[in-house]
Amino acid sequence: MIKKRKKNPYEASASGFYISMSAHKARRIIDQIRGRSYEETLMILELMPYRACYPIFKLVYSAAANASHNMGLNEASLVISKAEVNEGATMKKFKPRARGRSYLIKRQTCHISIVLEDISYEEYEEDFLRRI
């Protein structure tokens, strides 16, 4: 039996599927931003010179937009609580070569999911539990 995970009301997420880049290259960026604040993450992603930064930047921005629009959370108090990269399907193409031959070209894809959490809620909850 598969148990459903309870959704935290102070978490917002965004996922990107079949992004055409290697999962290894995307993980290199995700490891740098995991656990950081939303504003710090945007600055890091804008300044890093890798091609993988742009789709990750769009996902972080989208998750923050989901948090502010759908849940009414403040963007200044958001932290990346969970960020993961999984391998997607591999697209296979044939490149024509000399004498009627062909070489196989594999195009890697990956799935990226980012979860932002409101840290002001955690501070409020800790204070509440101390009072009890």
Curated annotation (Swiss-Prot):
One of its GO terms (biological process) is translation. Pfam families: Ribosomal_L22. PROSITE patterns: RIBOSOMAL_L22 (PS00464). Keywords: Chloroplast, Plastid, Ribonucleoprotein, Ribosomal protein, RNA-binding, rRNA-binding. GO terms for molecular function: rRNA binding; structural constituent of ribosome. Coiled coil: none annotated. It is found in: Plastid, Chloroplast. Gene3D superfamilies: Ribosomal protein L22/L17. GO terms for cellular component: chloroplast; large ribosomal subunit. The keyword Plastid applies. Belongs to the universal ribosomal protein uL22 family. Part of the 50S ribosomal subunit. This protein binds specifically to 23S rRNA. The globular domain of the protein is located near the polypeptide exit tunnel on the outside of the subunit, while an extended beta-hairpin is found that lines the wall of the exit tunnel in the center of the 70S ribosome. This is Large ribosomal subunit protein uL22c. It comes from Populus trichocarpa (Western balsam poplar).
